Amino acid sequence: MKNGFYATYRSKNKGKDKRSINLSVFLNSLLADNHHLQVGSNYLYIHKIDGKTFLFTKTNDKSLVQKINRSKASVEDIKNSLADDESLGFPSFLFVEGDTIGFARTVFGPTTSDLTDFLIGKGMSLSSGERVQIEPLMRGTTKDDVMHMHFIGRTTVKVEAKLPVFGDILKVLGATDIEGELFDSLDIVIKPKFKRDIKKVAKDIIFNPSPQFSDISLRAKDEAGDILTEHYLSEKGHLSAPLNKVTNAEIAEEMAYCYARMKSDILECFKRQVGKVKD
């Protein structure tokens, strides 16, 4: 999963007036009744993992929602029940810190648009003309920045199933009957030997004039850096970090760690993109 960072606020007058939505307060006000929301044929519901992290789930099984709302099952029990039968529902994870959030989505989990629908559907207070905004924070790391990286280590290349090379890679591995609708993507990890710099290889891939990948993340140092930092490059340049944990507690801990590690970048992006938000 990828933990993407977003700004949350309400706006009017074409974005000139911006106010905080106090997301943490609003979500916690819903939890006592285990509120869910029907959107079309799907149901959205939210449960708390810890003080800042929430499990946000989409399902089309009304009986599951009723069962969860009547039970005292932990979010771990809920997530495990979804994992046992993937047709029941799909989770995403939400980390809230002030007017910014971390949002990690499984393949079919609810999106940030679903979160917007949920907030509005559950009665978030909006004045006339106001809109809820969940805006991706865009980082400054670009291909040009890579040229100035002092050291590049482990590099992960994402190849989406829609790309022609996806099937070629599976065939090299021995697959013969490839049904495209079954797959989302492949992650190819290029792992160097201990303390070896693979900057040349990483740059060749990044600057490939005919790219056969969608996203790249890499562990790198810039010219002034003394530690390896995770850099995530995509067409949109969305500020984000990969998550590799399994349990809810691990995911919550990792999302908090990602936020703390990238806080300066997050706040800088927020200041540059959004500016001042009124209480």
Swiss-Prot record:
Pfam families given in the database record: RexA
Top-level taxon of the source organism: Viruses
Function comment: May confer an overall protective ability to the host cell by triggering a growth arrest and avoiding lethal host gene expression. Additionally, may confer symbiotic protection to the lysogenic host against secondary infection.
Protein name (record): Protein rexA
Protein's organism: Escherichia phage lambda (Bacteriophage lambda)
Gene: rexA
